[in-house]
Amino acid sequence: MNLILFGPPAAGKGTQAKRLVTERGMVQLSTGDMLRAAIASGSELGQRVKGVLDRGELVTDEIVIALIEDRLPEAEAAGGAIFDGFPRTVAQAEALDKMLAARGQKIDVVLRLKVDEPALIERIKKRFEEQGRPDDNPEVFVTRLAAYNAQTAPLLPYYEGQGKLTELDGMGTVEAVAASIDSALEPVAAG
């Protein structure tokens, strides 16, 4: 099963993806984690990515698609992928569809975690205090959220038109959101 966890920064995508990895043996393909790893490597690419993320902007489609494509064989071997933070644009979604189709696969379901903006801001402040991620700086977060809303919003009709979009309340506890996700995945896993 290939699924996309969709939602704004701090919606809980990473938390839920990690749980699904543990419980279902899927591979989490988190562009955020991949980009942070590139930065930590100190490579030229990592330095370019750092500058973009520090400004709260989105990394180019070309870079993100290449990172995902490199990890698809690993996901295929595990029997499925959780795409976390990808795709972010319609161009990325179309590229993902093509990459998966070339492997005889597809996206099975898109789960959108809906969280109110004030709750997102509180979550990001808490995460910034606890983890100190530069891209969680409250000022940078406002830019990230605006970029998400402007560039990612067109993906909703893209996946809704394919009958793959399921919207879930992401405002509850980690456990409540997990239960909603599990319920949404039951018919997909059975089908």
UniProtKB/Swiss-Prot annotation:
One of its GO terms (cellular component) is cytoplasm. Pathway: Purine metabolism; AMP biosynthesis via salvage pathway; AMP from ADP: step 1/1. Disulfide bonds: none annotated. One of its GO terms (biological process) is AMP salvage. Residues 126-136 are annotated as: LID. Monomer. Catalyzes the reversible transfer of the terminal phosphate group between ATP and AMP. Plays an important role in cellular energy homeostasis and in adenine nucleotide metabolism. This is Adenylate kinase. It comes from Caulobacter vibrioides (strain NA1000 / CB15N) (Caulobacter crescentus).
